[in-house]
Amino acid sequence: MTGSRRALFLCLLGLGACAATPMETAFLPEFRGFVSIDPVRHSIEQGADMITHRNRLVGQPWETARLVQALEFLAVEVPNGPRWNVMLPMAQLTMPAARAEWRQGFGIAPEARAQEVIDSLTEFRSAFAEQRPAAAPAALRAPLFSPGGQETLNRFADPPALPRTTRALLDARQELISQSFERRAGRNFIIR
């Protein structure tokens, strides 16, 4: 009896150790301290607009970096955020699935954590904002970015077509729109 309890305890302890892997989290620096702006909603709406008008991104690597920051944030927040797994059931599947496409397109290491990518791109964007474009390639260092430096900057200046990512963002935006419509339509619902 005691031996079987001990075995059960050790088995449960082993299972608990497997489940203890921390969930990946990410945040966008421009939303730090803002309570009234929903960073997920904003990232989906702005990202969908940016990715469907790729011509606006050509020659503006800092804007492409902003898009990639939003994508990295969404790939982590939508499936892991407690609110979004109910509100955006398709996006919680399609955003992480599209992640491999944009990471390959921009030379981002497949195993990189989202926050590392976001922080590096914040440094990249800051170099342009501070009118130090010569410092921007240094923020795109290997092994986080491959090959890194100026070659990676060139990818951001002329972003590749990302059909799977585009579809994921457009679907997420549609889910947001339908959620907003359902909430508005439900306001006038009266039970008699």
Model regions: which residues?
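Short, solvent-exposed mixed-charge patches
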Residues: C18, F189-R192
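N-terminal secretory signal peptides that target proteins for export/translocation
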Residues: M1-T2
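N-terminal export leaders
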Residues: R5-F9, C18
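Mature extracellular/secreted ectodomains of secretory-pathway proteins
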Residues: M50-F189
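Bacterial Sec signal peptide processing site at the extreme N-terminus
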Residues: L15-V35
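Short terminal alpha-helical segments
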Residues: V40-R54
